Amino acid sequence: MSDLKKAAQKAIELMDLTTLNDDDTDQKVIELCHKAKTPAGNTAAICIYPRFIPIARKTLNEMGCEEIKIATVTNFPHGNDDIAIAVLETRAAVAYGADEVDVVFPYRALMEGNETVGYELVKACKEACGDDVLLKVIIESGVLQDPALIRKASELSIDAGADFIKTSTGKVEVNATLEAAEIMMTVIAEKNPKVGFKPAGGVRDAAAAEEFLGVAERLLGKGWATPRTFRFGASSLLNNLLHTLELAEAPKGPQGY
C-alpha cells in the first residue's frame, strides 16, 4: 500500500464524520450514520447537533456499530462568554447521550484580553462532562490568527482540563491550517501528550491529511496519533479518501467542510 493510501486509511479511522448544517434532518443524520460505516472500516465518530443524538444512537445500534462515537457541539458556533449557558448546553448534550462534546472557546473574549473566562468556561464544561465524556475545545484558530493567541487559547484549554483541542468550527473563512496545527501540537507536546488534537474544516484530501499526520508524528512521535489523541473533523473528506483507496468514484461538484 502506498504512503498516500496508508494516510487515507488512517484518516478514515481518525475521522469525526460531520454534519452541522442548518437544514439537517433526521434523515440526513441517518444517512451520515450509514456513511460512517465505510468499505475501509468505520470512522471514529460522527459529529452532529445535540437534537439528533437519539436518532443517531438508535441508527448506529440498529447497524451494529455501537463503537462509532457520537460527538456534538455546544457554545457553537460563536464561542460566547456566558459560562452558565455553555454549561447548560453541555449538560444537555451529555443527558442526550453524547460520547464527546466539542465546545467553542470564548475566543473573542481572549482577543479582547480576557483570559479568565475561557479557562473558567472550559473547566466548568469539563466538570459537566465528567470522566466518561470527552471534551474537545474549539479555539477558532482561523479567527485568532495571531500565533500568540493560538498558543494562549491552547494552553488555557489544556490547563482547564480539555481532552482535545480543535482548530475550528468550520463556520468561518479560515479553518484548519498546518501553521495552527504546529502551534497547537507544540503546546500539547509541552504540556500533556495525552491531550488530543483535531483539525476541522479545510482538510480536503489524503495528501492534506498526510501533512497533518506528519506534523503530529514529528512533534509527538510515531504512533501517537490514535482515535484517542487525533481526529479529523470533516464531511467531504471521506469521499476523497475512499477514492484514494479505490473504493469510491471521484467526488463531483463543490466540496463542503
Swiss-Prot record:
Localisation: Cytoplasm
GO aspect biological process, one term: 2-deoxyribose 1-phosphate catabolic process
Pathway assignment: Carbohydrate degradation; 2-deoxy-D-ribose 1-phosphate degradation; D-glyceraldehyde 3-phosphate and acetaldehyde from 2-deoxy-alpha-D-ribose 1-phosphate: step 2/2
Positions annotated as active site in the UniProt record: D102, K166, K198
Alphabetized GO MF terms: deoxyribose-phosphate aldolase activity
Gene Ontology CC annotations of this record: cytoplasm
Broad EC category: lyase
UniProt keyword annotations, A-Z: Cytoplasm, Lyase, Schiff base
InterPro entries the record matches: Aldolase_TIM (IPR013785), DeoC (IPR011343), DeoC/FbaB/LacD_aldolase (IPR002915), DeoC_typeII (IPR023649)
Enzyme Commission number: 4.1.2.4
Taxonomic superkingdom: Bacteria
Cross-referenced HAMAP family: DeoC_type2
Family: Belongs to the DeoC/FbaB aldolase family. DeoC type 2 subfamily.
Protein task: Catalyzes a reversible aldol reaction between acetaldehyde and D-glyceraldehyde 3-phosphate to generate 2-deoxy-D-ribose 5-phosphate.
Record's protein name: Deoxyribose-phosphate aldolase
